[in-house]
Regions:
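Structured alpha-helical
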Residues: 1-103
Length: 103
């Protein structure tokens, strides 16, 4: 069974190897998230996403450069999985079960 994935758009403070950086949270699911940043972040770096209610720890497993910056995927630790009960990003849209209508 695949995890429910959600699109979102929210500025987040992400601690990367003990340094705080502002990044944009683009997508989230129970085991991970995708972020956008203006500067590169090394693959394998340990990160913490802190919100007012919770902390999600993990590591960067993929980094891609694109026209406007850097996109990277974080795999959350099994000890800190994401749930909407702990942190609900603004502009959340579930995409895992959306189907496009054919005309």
């Amino acid at each position: 069974m695949s995890a429910r994935r959600y699109l979102c758009s929210e500025l987040i403070s992400l601690r990367i190897n003990a340094i705080d950086a502002m990044v944009n949270l683009e997508e989230i699911w129970d085991r991970g998230a995708v972020f956008e940043a203006e500067k590169p972040i090394p693959e394998g770096a340990r990160v913490e996403m802190r919100t007012a209610q919770a902390l999600f720890a993990g590591k960067i497993i993929r980094v891609e450069q694109h026209e406007f910056g850097w996109r990277f995927e974080v795999e959350f630790s099994p000890l800190t999985p994401w749930s909407a009960d702990q942190f609900l990003p603004r502009h959340l849209l579930e995409v895992s079960e959306r189907k496009v209508e054919q005309k």
